[in-house]
Every structure is written in C-alpha cells, then in structure tokens.
Amino acid sequence: MKNGFLILFVFTALLSCKKVNPVITEPLPPSPTHPVMIYNDLHSAEVKYGQFKYLDIDNDGSFDLLFDVTLLGDPILQRDRLQFYANSRQERNLLNNSQDQSPVLNLMDPISKTHPGYTWYEISAILLAEKIITFNGNSWEGLWKNVSHKFLPVQVKKNGKLYHGWVELSFDTIKETLILHKSGISTEEDKEVKAGY
C-alpha cells in the first residue's frame, strides 16, 4: 500500500510538471526606412561649473554644439543662478519654444523638420536646467533638471540640406553635473530620425 501511494505520488508529480520554453526576445532588426547615422560615444563626459564641452556631432573637424555652465548673479532678486546651457553655432540648429527651452525626447521619439510648439533656430542658447541659490535655500528649475538618458534634438545644415540627430544627456543635481553620453546624426538629408536609434 505504501508503495502504491509512492508510485501514485511520483506519477502525479511527473504529470503536473511541464517543460517551459523560455521566451527569447531578439533585438529588432534595423528599420529599412531609418537613415544611416554617424554615432559618437561621448564617454559620459561631465560638464560642471567652470567647464565646457565642444561637440563635433558630424565628425567634420569643426564643433557643432557647446555645452557650458554659467553662474549669474541677480542683485535685484537677491539670488544666484547656476545655469546649464546647450549652444549651437551658425547652421547648427536647436529646437526652441517661446521660453527658449528645447523638448526632452524619449528613446525612439521622432526628430524631423517640424515639432509641434517648437521652431529650429541656429545660434541658439538653450537653458537646460538651473540651480536657484537664495538666502532661504536652493531649488532647481528647467525641463532637463531630472533627466536620465534623454535626447536633445539637433539639426545640422550643410550645403543647404538639413540633417537631423540627437545628443543623449543625463543630469545629476546632487553633483551639479550635466552628463553627455552619445550623439547621432543622419548621413542622409531631410530624413526623420528616431532619438537614440
């Protein structure tokens, strides 16, 4: 009788077990419609007060963007402002809204000639984030103050043609540091690109 229960238990246990095949997710194949890109690993370069970083996004030997930090004293409001900027030069464009801010893009967000609420401008100075320093305490402002691996849209104009791209950024308010991870720019003119692709 004991052996019968043991055999029945083992038989039931074997029937209740089933092999589960693991789900293997493969990376998506490259999109046949996405343009070929030039990528740069920026090695998580840090930009702090008193520092700046030039970026040659299209590898043509001249800088396209400048990231810098400025300390501005405001005696009227009795506060200081530690400001983190992204700057573009002639024929290098950043998206601007009416407050001179640029959108924070997520991975795979589209970047093209138009972006609702924003306009491409060359020779731009975009305030990414700022620390407001007062006698009553400090605070942070700006669209980019809490980002981690988000994308700044950029546009390069060469020979009258537009090339779209992005710079991957993070921000650390504790260290008061802007972090530059990667950049990408299309090699094909007037093509929509995906942020981070």
Range-by-range predicted roles:
Residues 13-16:
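C-terminal motif of bacterial Sec signal peptides marking the signal peptidase cleavage site
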Residues 9-10, 51:
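Residue-level detector of alpha-helix boundary/anchor positions
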